[in-house]
């Protein structure tokens, strides 16, 4: 569902992403790990079409994000690390607004919105202004809006920022359930325990280059370490 081929991106003299190639099939939860400035967020922004690569190609499903951006974005959802929400709308108004952007005409839209608000424990805030909601409540609302059009691919930059333990468990269970149903999820995180807990495969990026890829046992082989993911990560990304 996601195919990245020979992707490169510079910011002036700094090469943020170096010749990145990666394929993520349908029904996989893939975690991107890396230190600050490694190229994770830059890669996600290129996948969404927010940044244009210097060279290389990106396909979301059957669609090239550069030549067919509308078609690619129609089957994609994106949760950034610093999301923007319309603070003068209520959650219900916001979700109907997002549904309109995707031209959703499903007859059960209102019932779907209400069920989603209950699932994410937001039914009590359905008529409050978004600007009055806590950070965690806003994050949960963002997840509802991202899934509202039933995308085939979800890109998430730091999925658990500012969430309490209850919300974290809810999001982890939701992501695994979506993957079980065939959705493809790529997420970046600094939380190694999260990657170890929920990822089908893990990619470690450093200096813009993919330096390790696979399941935990495969990463252990590649790194020459039988330790934890933290041990592997620190060994591979430490400056010599």
Please tell me what each predicted stretch does.
Residues 96, 100, 107-125:
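Conserved ABC ATPase "signature" region
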